Amino acid sequence: MEVDERTFKELIHRHRDMIWSICKSYRLSAAWTTEDAFHEVLCDIWRGLGSFDKRSSERTWVYRVATNTMITLTRKIGNQPTMEATDYPEPSYRDDDYYDLVEMIEATTEPDRTIIKAHAQGFSYAEIAKITGLTVGAVSMRLTRALRQLRKQYNQ
């Protein structure tokens, strides 16, 4: 795929909200803002766009690049990724159960956190498998297990 500025701008325009949401879901440090992370993801998308081979959907590929960039940044900085309440629609009222659930999701490990977040954003098992590099069966099993654990924690 030939990379040109127009193609890149159109791709970013189509997926900017998803990219922003992913960037916002990781707390890096006081030195890194969501905007900094967003720009880092854009650079990685630009660098990788020429190698995008269309075996996966564009949306899946962008999600994977953004997630991998954020995980790499998190490792470089030495902080754990943290899901913020803004990753999900804000409840119409302050609901402590909602925030408890967000904290429980935040406490999960990779790749389960990525699987849960991608599932919440409507990705199919096949798309999540491409994002994580796992098989569809592994995604299904890990999601089922993670959701079961979340239900158990929530009901305690």
Show the residue positions of the predicted features.
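Structural recognition of an alpha-helix C-terminal capping motif at a helix-to-coil junction
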Residues: D36-C43, R47, S56-N68
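DNA-recognition helix of helix-turn-helix
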Residues: T67, I71, A126, T132-Q156
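Hydrophobic positions on the alpha-helical face of helix-turn-helix-like DNA-binding modules
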Residues: V41, V65, I115-I116, I128-A129, ...
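C-terminal flanking helix
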Residues: R16, W20, L42, R113, ...
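Acidic, proline/glycine-rich intrinsically disordered inter-domain spacer in sigma factors
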Residues: P81-E106
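Arg/Lys-rich amphipathic alpha helix in sigma70-family domain 2
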Residues: S51-D53, R64-E84
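Short, charged helix-capping/linker segments at alpha-helix termini
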Residues: E2-E10, W20-E40, S51-D53, I131, ...
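Short amphipathic alpha helix immediately N-terminal
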Residues: A107-I131, N155-Q156
